[in-house]
Structures are given as C-alpha cells and as structure tokens.
C-alpha cells in the first residue's frame, strides 16, 4: 500500500506541474497525450483505492456526480460591483476625487475580463469552496464546477488561509468550438463567451462543465493577513508566486494620463487577445490608501471600471446563404454589404437558425444593425424597420437540402433543420475535410480546395478513397506539381500509421470528440473489439454518456460503415491503439481486472477488509451491480444487489466460495 501511496503522490505532483505549465504559464513541457496517460493511471488507482482520492486530486478536474441544485452561501465579505466610467470626463472626475481625498496617487490598470465573477476560499493551502457573486451578499456554491478549471490550483505551495477573487471566462477558441458543436447538434448556440462561461458554471453536472474548457484570472485577495503585500501590484505578484493565474497585461501608472494611454492602447489592441474584455479596471495601487478611502454601500471608492463603448454599425443584408455541415445541420449566414466593425471589415455574419431569423424579423434587403458579439463573431442584432423596402418578404428556410435536394427535417428538441441523406454531397465533402484534419488523420497538404477538386473529379467519394489515390490522379489538378504530389502521397502513406483514436475521431461519429475517441481506443484497443461493443457496456464508461453510446453503436452496426472500414483496412490503415496503456496493479488472475460487488454481512472478515484484499489482487470493487459487474460476493442477508445480480446472470459467490479462493492463492 505504501508503493501505491507514493505513486499517487508522484502523479499528483506531475499532473499539477503539467497543468500549471499549460494553463497558467502557457508553456507546456509535455504533449497532451502524456498528461492524459498519467491522468488515466491516477483515475484507475483511485477507483481501486478510493481512500487515496482527495478533494485536491487532479482527477476532480473531469467532474463528478451531478447535483440537484446549488446551495446559497453568504459571502464572508460582500462582493461589491465597481462604479462605471464611460468617457474621459468620467475618468478625470474620478481622478480628481481621489486626489482631493488622499493626495498623490499611483494607479494599477487591469484588463476587465468579460466573464463571471467568482470567489475562491483556501484553508491550509487547499481550495475548499467557490462561490458566484450572486447579489453581492449571497452567492451560489459552484465548488465542484470550479474544481474542473485547470487554472485554479487545488492546492498551493503555502498552508495559507485566505479568499481570492477573480473572473472565470471562456477563451475565444473554446467558445467557437462549443458553438460549432452546438450548431452541429442542432442546439441553440450561446450569444457570447460570457454567457457561455456563466451557463457552463451553472451546470448541475460538473462533467459537462469540465468539457467547456473554462479558465480564470484572479485579481484580488480578500484578506491579506497572511500576505506581505502593501500594494495591489505586490498582491498580484504574490498570487503569481503561489501558482495562481493573474493577467499579465496589467500596468502601474503614475497619473490619469497614464490611465488614458493604457485605455487607448487596449481599445485598439483588444481584438488581438485570446479572450474577451469589456473594459479597463483602474485601482488605487497603495492598499493603505484603499483602506483610507473605504467603500460606499455599493462599490469601493478607490476603483472604477471604464466600459468600452459598444460598437454597432448599419449595413445592408444582401442575401442569406445556406451551408450544410458534416452532420447535416443547415446553417444560415447573412451576406452583408462590407462594413468596418471594431477595426475589421465584415461581410458575413452568422444567423444560427430559422428561429432566430423569425424572432428578430430579419429579411433580405433590410438595413440591419451589426455588432461584433464579444469581439469574435459578427452578429445581426436587428433590422431597422423604418428603412425596410416595401417589397420585403418574411424569410423561410427551404424545405429541401440546397445541396442534394433531400427533404430537410427538424429533430424533436432541436432548433436546427437537418439533411439526413447519408449521400448528401455537401456533408460528404465536410466529412472528408474533417477526416484529414490535424486532430484526426492529420494529412498535411490535403486542404479544402484539393478535396473539392478530388470530389468534383470523382476521384474520391469516401474517406477510404484517399488511400487509393495515385500520382496520375493528382498531377492534373490545379497547382499540383510533381514535388507537391510526392509530398502529399507521402503524407497520406504516413497517416496510415496513426493510432486508432485518430481514425475514430476522423470518421465523424456524431457526439464523438477527441477525448472520447482516446477513451474508446485505449479501452478496446482494436476496431474489431469495438465492433462487438454494446450500448449498455459503453454507458458504464466514464466520459461516455447515453447519447454517445447510442451513436457509436448505431454507427458501427451500419453495414456501409463495416464495408468502409474493410476498405481502409485493405490499404493497411492502422486499426489498433498504439498508445501506452495505463498501468495496472498485478494480482491473482481470478480477481485481477474483475469488477466485484460485496453485499450482505460477512462472517470471516468485514466488508472493508474484503474490499482491501480484493483491491490488492487487482480487482475493482464497486458499490452497485450493473451489467458489467463480473462477480457478486454475497454474505448473509444480501438484498437487492443479489436480486439484481441474479437478474443480470452475474456470477455469484458465497462467502465460503470466496474464502476458498483466498486460501487457494
């Protein structure tokens, strides 16, 4: 057991270090696959030895059991909002008021992150509770969801007791990925990253929150008793040293002119950031001066938030263009008369779905208001009705697919229209583009334009055809010289060696992402083994939900898919997992790797002693009987678990049979 404990401690240290490098320093020293491998190893050990699982284990990052509601908790100190400034005049008045009160002053300027304010409590250096701002006096306990954010340390270097506050946010890249996924699934996308972050942190199921890839910037310490800082800048530096993520774009300035210069700089540069900001926060830097100035009932007197003006422009909606994704979702896009918004020229904007078009009564030919939602995606806010042409008509989505002509359907519970024709050209092309992408088969040089040419020239119809391409097929294509063709054929040949998880992701199975592809590949090791899997078996696996289990089984049972896999195999495309399996604790073959449930009263030992002994033999001891349970050991007065085992046909041992097995070792 001492060896297991040491390994758990080592895994904690490694995973925390790698997480800090990736999510806080943005400078990873190992690939994602190495982190995932170690995390899977720790998950397996904790399942066999739950006594070694702690609240600060890196495994809590993946989420836990769903909650029924969030508990309301009073803040130890109210989370006040900041007063607002909207222009230079407001800022100069603020500065004058400060100087009239305390004389000479130095300011700390910080980016105002557009997210959800949170408060994190640490006791003896461990993260124990996280709350939303709520009404400022009472917030909601979202601790389990906050534990899934890798930028929040679960344990810090020093055994300190304090509360740190900050802003949880969704990076732009995560937001775009999430909305693409929602649209592919026919769901209503989020309007902006702030809404997405807030919605993610209010998920009752922390496993869903974990998938949303949130981050956090910390900006203040509520109780500095155990800190040495005398200024805001020093407090942030101490947080840096403790392993917290603070925003590094902050700047200390000596007067209001420095504040105005900082605002001017970030007004023009904010589009270059990987996250949204909606303004600048200006604070008196000296903490003793902050204390001297104090607070009003609503906000601190020593700080103010400058809000960026919302940039909206008017342009003309020329047309509505439809695109079909690889899952058949039909997405309308506004084609606009080009116009500058927030420093960039905009000629297209997403309209998401027909419901949104009707809700906002947007029509072709309208003069429309455009804004850049969260600095990312241009959004059509509304039509200007008094400029509407007399001949305008209410827009209706087509009843048939614009690519293949198949009838469009709206699946119950979805807002999107979907083409369900498996032979739809637009879907097939999008599927081919997905198959060759970096996270799938990673075929360098096989871009969108070449795929379109190959498809239009009937050289490829499915993903397997890629591996049947020859030099004479490629040379006649536009901009394809001999050297380029040779490199492409080499890349195609190299891709055949990709591990099974890349192939699974590349096939485009609905709901199957990168992470779940890795889980399935590692667990089942070969495509042949996956063909045998059942829906009930998949549901038992962590990270695999009901929808995904059904989707995978339905996909793999399809005879056309079986033929496609065979076609790939005939060209020696790898069908096996090539990664390193997570380590297993060796034990007796009668028990090692088996899922065992103990029920009823044992006479020769306690159930806890039996459980510990089984784990030492490599068994996984669980509390509930499922179809994947291998053995149920039943003592006296065994109840519903025994009945369930009989129903499933699970192997049942009496205590005597169990003792006999023990004695035989």
Curated annotation (Swiss-Prot):
Zn(2+) binds at residues 401, 404, 419, 424. Its cofactor is Mg(2+); Mn(2+). NAD(+) binds at residues 32-36, 81-82, 110, 133, 167, 283, 307. Residues 586-665 form the BRCT domain. Signal peptide: none annotated. Pfam families: BRCT, DNA_ligase_aden, DNA_ligase_OB, DNA_ligase_ZBD, HHH_2, HHH_5, Nlig-Ia. HAMAP family: DNA_ligase_A. This is DNA ligase. It comes from Staphylococcus epidermidis (strain ATCC 12228 / FDA PCI 1200). The gene is ligA.
